[in-house]
UniProtKB/Swiss-Prot annotation:
RNA-binding component of the eukaryotic translation initiation factor 3 (eIF-3) complex, which is involved in protein synthesis of a specialized repertoire of mRNAs and, together with other initiation factors, stimulates binding of mRNA and methionyl-tRNAi to the 40S ribosome. The eIF-3 complex specifically targets and initiates translation of a subset of mRNAs involved in cell proliferation. Residues 895-909 have a biased composition (Low complexity). This is Eukaryotic translation initiation factor 3 subunit A. It comes from Aedes aegypti. One of its GO terms (biological process) is formation of cytoplasmic translation initiation complex.
Length: 1133
C-alpha cells in the first residue's frame, strides 16, 4: 500500500510501474486503495475510473483473486449503476471475457502437457503407471486437476459474483440473463454437473426474491412483461442445457419454473416458445419413463403446430401425426387396479403427482391411454399418419388376430430400426411390450391352456425369460388369471369363476368374456332376459299405469308451469344481480388496487427523488471535502518531496513511519528537518576539526622523511632526462632530413599539374560567380521584403499593445468605480438596517407600554363595573319594596326622572311602529334585565353623572364611561383633541334625531354605545401608527354619515359606517372633542323632555319625564328646530 492516498490517474501510473518491475501484487494493492477510499466514489467520472477498473480486474484475473475482484465490482456498481450503466456492463463483460480466455488457455496448456512426451516408444513411464495405480486417474486427469481446475474454479466464482451483483438491478437486467446463459454454457462445456445444480438453485432463489414486493423502484419487478420474457428465455436455455447434460431432475424443475412464469404472464406466450416448451417437456417425460404424459405432450405440440404454424407441409403433418400415434400406442396398458387405487385412503401422492404433471400440460385432469386414443381419433390424427402406423393401430386396437399379431408388428419394427437416426426407434421396446400384453390377452380368450413353446412361437420377438416376465406382470398389474406349469411346459389361463377384477369393459379387441367376467355379468344378463320375456308375454300390462303417470305429469306441469317459469326468471335475475355485484366489487377492488399502486409508485418516486437529492448533496459535500483534503495532501506531498531531495530530509523521513507522517503537518516536518540539519552540521564540523589535526601531523612527518629521497630522485631524473633528450634530438634530425627530401620530390611532381589547375580554377570561378550574383540579388530582395514586413508587424503590435493597455486601464477604472459604489451601497444598507431595527425596537417598546396601560384600565373598569352592579342590585332591591302602582299617582308631581315612568297602555296606544328598541338600546342581559311580571322596574343612571347611553332607560355601565377615551393617548383625558373644531357648542344639548323619541337616547358616542355592551373602542390601546400608514387615510369612527343622510342608523359610533377619507384630512370630530369630561355639551340628553337637562339636576322641574321615552307624533318632531338650533330630518324607510 502506498504511503499517501493516490489520485486515480497517479495510482494507475504507479500500478503500471509495479507491473513493469514484476510486482503485480503491489500494483493490485495500489489500485485497490482507490476503490477503498470513499472520497473517490462520486468525484471522478467513468472516463477516469473505467481504465483503472479494467487494469484492476486484469490483475485480479492474473493473480486469481476473485474475492478482491468482487469487492471492486460492487464498489463500481454503486458508483455508476445510476449514472452510466453501459460502463458497468462493459467492465463486467470484459472481466468475464478475460477469465474465459485464461481458462481456455489453461485447457490448451493442460492438453499440450500430455503431448510433450520425451519418448514416443515408451508412453507409459514407471511414474505414470504408479500414479494411475494409486489414484485411478490417467495423465490427462492429473494435468487438468493441476492446471485447468484452478482456472475453472476462478471462472465459476466470477460467474456467481456477477450474478449476485446484478440480481435485483433493473438497469442491468439484460446483462444478468446474458451472464446466466454464459454460466450454463460454462457448465455444459466443462461438464460441471454439481455447479449446474448450484446455478439452478441460485437462479431460482433470485426469482423468488424479485417476486416479493420491494420498496425500491430501481429493483427488478416480475410484473413487467420484459422481465417475464427474459426469465422465460433463461429458463428455456437452462432446460436445454439440463437435457444435454442428462440432469433430468433439474430439467423438471426448470419446466416447473417455465410453467410458473407462463402462468404469471398476463399475455399468452408466443407459439414458438410454447412449441419449444412442449417439445422439451415430452423429452423429459420420456427420459423419466412416463410414456403416458410423453404422448400427451406430443399431442399438445401437434395441436399447437396445426393451429398456429403457417404454411405447414403435408410431410410435416404426417411426420407429427405418426409420432403422436406411435407414442400413444407405445403407452403401456393400464393396470386394472393401480397401486394408488388400492391405498387411496392412506396414500394420495401418486394421484397428486399425476395431477401436478397434468397442470404442466394445461390439462384439467390426468390423461389416460383410452382418453388419448379418443383424442387421436377426434383430432383426425389416425387418418393423417403414415399407412404403416395406421395398420399398427388397427392391429393393436381393433382387430383380433393373436396368431399373426406379433409377426405384423415385427415387420413395422424392422422398418423403423433400419435407419439408426429414425426418431421412432426409441418406441420399439415399448411397442413390443404392448404387443406381448395384447397377445397374452387375446390368447387367454381363445385358449384355456397352451404349450409354452407354441406361445413362444407366437411371440416372435421375445425370449422365454422375457415372456415369463410379461406373464407375471400381467397377473400383477392387469389382474389376469394365469398359471405357468413348468413341469408340463404349458400356460393355463383363468378358469375359476371368481369375482371380476375390473369394473369396466376391457379395452382392446375381445372375442368373448373371460370366465372371471361371468360373475359380474350373470345377474345383469338374467335381468335383461326376464324383462324381455315379460314384455313378450304381456305387452299391455303397464299401459294404464303409464297413461296415468303421463296424465299426472302433464297436470303437474300445467300447474307449476308459471310458478316454475317465474322461479327460473327470479333465479336468472338473482344470477344477473350477483354477476353485476361481483363485477362492481371487482371493479371497485381493481380501482382501489390501482389507486394503491399509483400511491405506492408516487411514494416510491418521491422517495427516489429524496434519495437522489440526498445523494447529490452528499456527493457535493464529499467532493468539497475531498478537494480540500487533496489540496492539503498536495501541499504536504510537495513539502515532503522537497525534503526528500536532501540527505537530511531522507534521514528524517526514515525515522518516522507512515502513521506518524500522516499526523504531522508540513511545518512540523520542516522544523524536524532544520533541527536534523543543525545536528549534522555540528557533527560535520567536529569531524573536520579532528581530521584536520590528523592530516596535519601525518603530512609533516611524511614531508620530513621524503626530503632526502626526493633529492636523490631528482638527481637520477636529471641524468635520465638528458639521455632521453639526446636520443630524441638525433631521431628528430634524421626524420626532418627524410621529410625534406620527400617534400622536394612531391613538389617537382605537382609542378607539372599547375597549368591544368589554373584553367579549371578560372572556369569554375566564372560559373560560380554568376550563380553567386543571382543568389545575392534574390537574397537582398527577400531581405528588404522581410525587413518591411517585420517593421509593419512591429507597428501593428505596438498599436495593439497600446490599445490593450488602454482597455485594461479603462476596465480597471470601471471596476474600481463599481467597487466603490458597491461599498457605498452596502454601507447605506447597513445604516438603513440599523435605523429600521432601532425604529422597530422603539415601536415594540411603545406597544408594550400601551398594552400595559390598556390592561390596567381594563382591570380598573372591571372593578368599577362590579361596584356599579352591586349598587344597582341594591337599588333594585329597594325598588321592589315599593308598591307596584305608586308611580302612577305621581305623574303630575315633581318626582325625579329616575322614578317617573309612563303608562304602558297609553304609551303602547300612541307609539308608532318603529324599531327604536332594536335600533337603539339593546335589552339588558343577565341580572340587569327587567322582570316579566308586569311591573316595570326602573333603572338608574350612573351615579357619577354620566349621561345615559341608550334608549329605554338602559343604565350606563362602567365600561361605557371609558368610551370617550378612544382617541390617541386615551389616558390624557382628551386633551390632545381640545383644539380641534367642534360640531356643536359647549352648552348645547346633544343633537336629536328627527321623528320619534329615539333622539333621547343620549349623545352619540364614538367608542360604541350601550346597545351591545361591548365596551369602547380605544384608540390609545393600539400601537402607534407609522408615517406610511397615516398617509393612507383615517376612517371615521363616528356617525357623520348618519347625520348627513338623516337616516336611522342603528349603530352610533360603530365601525360599519366609517367613510374612507384616504389621502385627505380627517373628518370633523367635533362631536366628542374639546372640553373636559364634565362639560355641558358632552353630558347626555335627558330621559324625557326637550330641554336637554340631566335627571340629577332637574329635581325642581314640574313634570318628571318617563325614562322609557314615550313616542311622540312624527310631525311634531320635524316642524321646528331643536333647542340648540339643529333640525333633524326623518329618514323614511
Amino acid at each position: 500500500m502506498s504511503r499517501y492516498m493516490q489520485r486515480p490517474e497517479n495510482a494507475l501510473k504507479r500500478a503500471n510501474e509495479f507491473i513493469e518491475v514484476g510486482k503485480p501484487a503491489r500494483a493490485l494493492d495500489t489500485l485497490q486503495e482507490v476503490f477503498r477510499i470513499k472520497k473517490w466514489t462520486y468525484t471522478w467520472s467513468e472516463s477516469v475510473i473505467e481504465p483503472i477498473m479494467f487494469k484492476y480486474l486484469d490483475l485480479c484475473v492474473e493473480l486469481k483473486k476473485s474475492h478482491i475482484a468482487k469487492e471492486g465490482l460492487f464498489q463500481y456498481r454503486n458508483m455508476f449503476q445510476l449514472v452510466n450503466v453501459g460502463s458497468l456492463e462493459n467492465v463486467i463483460r470484459g472481466y468475464l471475457k478475460m477469465a474465459e480466455e485464461r481458462t481456455e488457455a489453461a485447457q490448451q496448456q493442460s492438453s499440450q502437457a500430455i503431448l510433450d512426451i520425451d519418448d514416443l516408444d515408451n508412453l507409459a513411464t514407471p511414474e505414470s503407471i504408479l500414479m494411475s495405480a494409486v489414484c485411478g486417474e490417467d495423465a490427462q486427469d492429473r494435468s487438468d486437476r493441476t492446471i485447468l481446475l484452478p482456472w475453472v474454479k476462478f471462472l465459476w466464482e466470477s460467474y456467481c459474483q456477477c450474478l449476485e451483483l446484478l440480481k435485483v438491478n433493473s438497469h442491468c437486467e439484460n446483462l444478468y440473463h446474458d451472464i446466466a446463459k454464459m454460466a450454463f454454457g460454462f457448465c455444459l462445456k466443462y461438464n460441471r454437473k454439481m455447479e449446474f445444480r448450484k446455478l439452478c438453485e441460485k437462479l431460482r432463489k433470485h426469482l423468488e426474491d424479485i417476486s416479493k414486493v420491494s420498496s425500491q423502484t430501481a429493483n427488478v419487478s416480475i410484473s413487467k412483461p420484459e422481465t417475464q420474457q427474459l426469465n422465460l428465455d433463461t429458463r428455456l436455455n437452462q432446460l436445454d442445457c439440463a437435457i444435454q447434460m442428462e440432469l433430468w431432475l433439474e430439467a423438471y424443475k426448470a419446466i416447473e419454473d417455465i410453467h410458473g412464469l407462463m402462468t404469471l404472464s398476463k399475455k399468452t406466450p408466443m407459439p414458438k416458445t410454447m412449441a419449444l416448451y412442449y417439445q422439451k417437456l415430452a423429452m423429459v417425460f420420456w427420459k423419466a419413463g412416463n410414456q403416458l404424459f410423453h404422448a400427451a405432450a406430443l399431442l399438445k405440440l401437434f395441436q399447437l403446430s396445426r393451429d398456429m404454424k403457417k404454411n405447414v407441409t403435408q410431410e410435416e403433418i404426417q411426420r407429427m401425426t405418426s409420432h403422436v400415434l406411435i407414442a400413444t400406442l407405445a403407452i403401456p396398458l393400464p393396470s386394472a387396479h393401480p397401486e394408488f387405487d388400492r391405498f387411496i385412503e392412506t396414500d394420495k401422492s401418486p394421484l397428486e403427482k399425476a395431477q401436478k404433471l397434468a397442470v404442466l400440460l394445461g390439462l384439467q385432469q390426468p390423461p389416460t391411454r383410452a382418453s388419448l386414443l379418443k383424442d387421436v381419433l377426434r383430432l383426425n390424427v389416425l387418418q393423417l399418419a403414415a399407412p404403416q402406423f395406421q395398420n399398427l393401430y388397427k392391429w393393436l386396437e381393433v382387430e383380433f388376430d393373436p396368431l399373426n399379431l406379433c409377426e405384423r408388428v415385427q415387420n413395422i419394427i424392422q422398418e423403423i430400426t433400419v435407419d439408426e437416426n429414425n426418431p421412432y426407434a426409441q418406441y420399439t421396446q415399448a411397442l413390443q411390450d404392448v404387443t406381448l400384453v395384447r397377445l397374452v390377452r387375446q390368447v387367454s380368450q381363445v385358449y384355456q391352456s397352451i404349450e409354452f413353446s407354441r406361445f413362444l412361437a407366437l411371440a416372435k420377438f421375445s425370449t422365454s425369460f422375457y415372456l415369463e416376465r410379461i406373464l407375471v406382470d400381467c397377473v400383477r398389474h392387469n389382474d389376469m388369471q394365469i398359471t405357468i406349469d413348468h413341469r408340463n411346459h404349458c400356460v393355463h389361463f383363468g378358469t375359476d369363476l371368481s369375482e371380476s377384477q375390473r369394473e369396466d369393459h376391457p379395452d382392446g379387441p375381445t372375442l368373448q368374456s373371460m370366465p372371471s367376467e361371468q360373475v359380474r355379468s350373470q345377474l345383469v344378463n338374467m335381468s335383461v332376459v326376464l324383462h324381455r320375456a315379460i314384455a313378450t308375454i304381456n305387452p299391455n300390462r303397464n299401459k294404464a299405469e303409464r297413461d296415468r303417470l303421463r296424465a299426472q305429469m302433464v297436470k303437474s306441469y300445467e300447474e307449476n308451469m308459471v310458478k316454475e317459469h317465474q322461479r327460473i326468471l327470479q333465479r336468472q335475475k338473482k344470477i344477473e344481480d350477483r354477476k353485476e355485484y361481483i363485477e362492481r366489487v371487482n371493479l371497485e377492488r381493481e380501482e382501489k388496487e390501482l389507486r394503491e399502486l399509483e400511491e405506492v409508485a408516487r411514494q416510491h418516486k418521491l422517495a427516489e427523488q429524496r434519495r437522489l437529492e440526498q445523494e447529490n448533496e452528499e456527493r457535493e459535500r464529499k467532493r468539497y471535502e475531498n478537494e480540500v483534503q487533496m489540496i492539503k495532501e498536495r501541499n504536504m506531498k510537495e513539502k515532503i518531496d522537497q525534503i526528500k531531495q536532501t540527505a537530511a530530509g531522507q534521514k528524517i523521513l526514515k525515522k518516522f513511519d507512515e502513521e506518524d507522517i500522516k499526523k504531522m503537518n508540513a511545518e512540523e516536518i520542516a522544523a524536524k528537518e532544520a533541527e536534523e540539519r543543525q545536528k549534522e552540521r555540528k557533527a560535520h564540523d567536529n569531524n573536520l576539526k579532528s581530521q584536520e589535526k590528523k592530516i596535519d601531523y601525518f603530512e609533516r612527518a611524511k614531508r620530513l622523511e621524503e626530503i632526502p629521497l626526493i633529492e636523490k630522485y631528482l638527481e637520477d631524473k636529471l641524468v635520465q632526462d638528458k639521455q632521453f633528450w639526446e636520443k630524441q634530438e638525433a631521431s628528430r634530425i634524421e626524420a626532418a632530413i627524410a621529410e625534406r627530401k620527400n617534400a622536394e620530390a612531391v613538389q617537382e611532381r605537382l609542378k607539372r599539374m599547375q597549368p591544368d589547375r589554373e584553367i579549371f580554377w578560372q572556369k569554375l570561378k566564372g560559373e560560380r560567380s554568376n550563380q553567386f550574383a543571382e543568389k545575392l540579388k534574390a537574397f537582398n530582395v527577400a531581405l528588404e521584403e522581410e525587413r518591411k514586413r517585420r517593421l509593419t508587424e512591429r507597428v501593428y503590435e505596438r498599436r495593439e499593445e497600446r490599445r490593450q493597455k488602454w482597455l485594461r486601464e479603462k476596465e480597471e477604472e470601471r471596476r474600481r468605480a463599481e467597487e466603490e459604489i458597491r461599498k457605498q451601497r452596502q454601507e447605506e444598507e447597513r445604516i438603513e438596517r440599523e435605523r429600521r431595527a432601532e425604529e422597530r425596537r422603539i415601536e415594540d417598546e411603545k406597544a408594550r407600554l400601551l398594552e400595559e396601560k390598556r390592561r390596567a384600565r381594563e382591570e380598573e373598569a372591571t372593578k368599577k363595573a362590579e361596584e356599579n352592579r352591586q349598587m344597582q342590585a341594591k337599588a333594585r332591591e329597594r325598588e321592589r319594596e315599593r308598591e307596584a302602582d305608586s308611580w302612577r299617582d305621581r305623574r303630575g308631581g315633581d318626582a325625579p326622572a329616575a322614578a317617573a315612568q309612563p303608562n304602558p297602555a297609553a304609551q303602547e296606544a300612541t307609539k308608532p311602529e318603529s324599531g327604536w328598541r332594536t335600533a337603539g338600546a339593546r335589552e339588558p342581559r343577565g341580572e340587569d334585565a327587567p322582570k316579566k311580571d308586569g311591573v316595570y322596574q326602573p333603572r338608574f343612571r350612573d351615579v357619577r353623572g354620566g349621561g345615559a347611553g341608550g334608549a329605554g332607560g338602559v343604565e350606563r355601565r362602567a365600561d361605557d364611561q371609558e368610551s370617550n377615551k378612544w382617541r390617541h393617548g386615551g389616558d390624557d383625558g382628551g386633551k390632545d383633541d381640545r383644539d380641534g373644531p367642534r360640531r356643536m357648542g359647549g352648552d348645547r344639548p346633544p343633537m336629536r334625531r328627527g321623528g320619534d323619541d329615539r333622539d333621547d337616547r343620549g349623545p352619540i358616542r364614538r367608542g360604541g354605545d350601550d346597545r351591545d355592551d361591548r365596551g369602547p373602542i380605544r384608540r390609545g390601546d393600539r400601537p402607534p401608527m407609522r408615517d406610511g400608514e397615516r398617509g393612507v387615510g383615517m376612517r371615521r369612527e363616528g356617525g357623520d354619515r348618519e347625520r348627513r343622510d338623516g337616516g336611522d342608523r342603528r349603530d352610533f359610533g360603530g365601525n360599519r359606517d366609517r367613510r374612507d377619507d384616504r389621502g385627505g384630512p380627517r373628518r370633523d370630530d367635533r362631536g366628542d372633542r374639546g372640553g373636559d369630561r364634565d362639560s355641558a355639551w358632552r353630558r347626555p340628553a335627558p330621559r324625557g323632555g326637550d330641554d336637554g337637562g340631566n335627571w340629577r339636576t332637574r329635581q325642581d322641574q314640574a313634570k318628571p319625564k318617563d325614562d322609557r321615552r314615550e313616542e311622540r307624533p312624527k310631525e311634531a318632531r320635524n316642524t321646528g328646530p331643536d333647542e340648540d338650533g339643529w333640525t333633524d330630518v326623518k329618514h323614511h324607510r
